[in-house]
Structure formats: C-alpha cells, structure tokens
Regions:
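OB-fold ssDNA-binding interfaces and closely related basic DNA-contact patches used
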Residues: 1-147
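Extended serine/threonine-enriched, polar tracts that run as long, contiguous segments within proteins
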Residues: 132-201
Length: 202
C-alpha cells in the first residue's frame, strides 16, 4: 500500500530555492477574473492588482508525503477540510521536523510577499494552535472539489480498497500526499493552502 503514495519526504525540499511567479488580475472589477504573468521588481504586497503567485521548486510543484498524522475531527464536509495533527510534536523528532518545514515554508512566503512583523497578520497561516496550547498544533488541508463533476478530486485507500472521503472519521490515522497551492490575495490578505491528492487510512 505504500506504493499508493508518492513517498516524497519533506527533506527533499528543505533548504532548496523556491521560485515564485506573479500573476496580475487584468480587471479586478469583473466577476470572472483573468490573470497574466508579470515580471516585477516590486514587493507583491505593494501590487494593488495582484491575483496570485505560483510556487515551484526546481521548476516542479511541491508535493510531499506527510508522516502518519491523526485527523481529530474527521472530514469536514462544510468547508471541505481535513485537520491533521502534529501528534506528539515535543517528543517525535520526525513530526517536529515536518512542522518546522511547513512553518519555514510559510515564513519564506511572507518574506517574498514583503510582509514585516507589523503586517505579518495579513498572511493566513495554515498551522492552527489552540489558544491555551493544551493540544498539539494542527495543519489545515483542503480536499479539492470539482464542481462540474460534483466530486472530490482525491484518491483514498483503506485496507487495499478505494473508499470515499466520508470514511475519514474522528481520530483516523492518515498518511497523505499533499501539495502546495498558489498564494492567493483575498480580502487584502494572503493565503496559501495545502491540498491533498492521496490519502492512506491506516
């Protein structure tokens, strides 16, 4: 079953140069947006008609395989999200390494955008901490949905069988192939979501 996943460790992307491509919105007043690639020396946070920013590593999209992670809340059909817990992060060096990688990637994006300590809250992190810090942090992951097909664009296996995303229940243990989405500007804030391609339910 391990062959079902791409089995790309996050260390493959550690300390590698990321490439960013800026796409501008041709007419922000239109409901159906069109975007054009634009080389620029300006900090993206200062571009008023910024549409999105593509991210690659060595010209390839960033897709990696997570460690085994607990999904505390199961699949959330309302927002099509999975919450993956960095379980036992204080004692598990592999989990801590994965957390540091995700956090480092977000910091790299913030620096590229041109955000400072004063404007850092304009970047919407996908790492979630509870306010009292009683629990391990979580990573928010999106399950892509194709509206024209009315279906989820994800492959899921459990015990050698394909299953639906609704089979991911509270506290399921998962290993996932996730990939990074573009940095989007939304309501004057910036968000870069992780999306899931393959899920192995353990």
């Amino acid at each position: 079953m391990e062959n079902f996943l791409v089995n790309k460790h996050h260390n493959l992307f550690s300390n590698k140069q990321l490439s960013y491509k800026v796409y501008l919105c041709k007419d922000c007043s239109k409901k159906k947006k069109e975007y054009i690639h634009q080389e620029t020396d300006h900090k993206p946070c200062n571009i008023l008609n910024l549409g999105y920013i593509g991210i690659t590593c060595n010209k390839y999209p960033i897709m990696l395989t997570t460690p085994i992670m607990v999904c505390p809340f199961g699949f959330n059909s309302q927002n099509q999200n999975l919450t993956l817990q960095f379980t036992n992060i204080k004692n598990d060096s592999e989990m801590k390494s994965f957390y540091d990688f995700i956090q480092g990637l977000e910091l790299n994006q913030m620096q590229y955008l041109g955000l400072t300590e004063d404007t850092a809250d304009l970047y919407l992190t996908q790492i979630r901490h509870d306010k009292e810090e009683k629990y391990d942090p979580n990573l928010l992951v999106k399950v892509p949905f194709i509206h024209k097909n009315n279906s989820y664009d994800v492959n899921i296996k459990h015990n050698d069988s394909s299953v639906a995303v609704t089979n991911i229940f509270k506290f399921s243990k998962l290993k996932c192939d996730i990939y990074i989405d573009n940095i989007w500007k939304f309501n004057d804030k910036y968000v870069c979501k992780w999306k899931v391609k393959n899920i192995l339910i353990l």
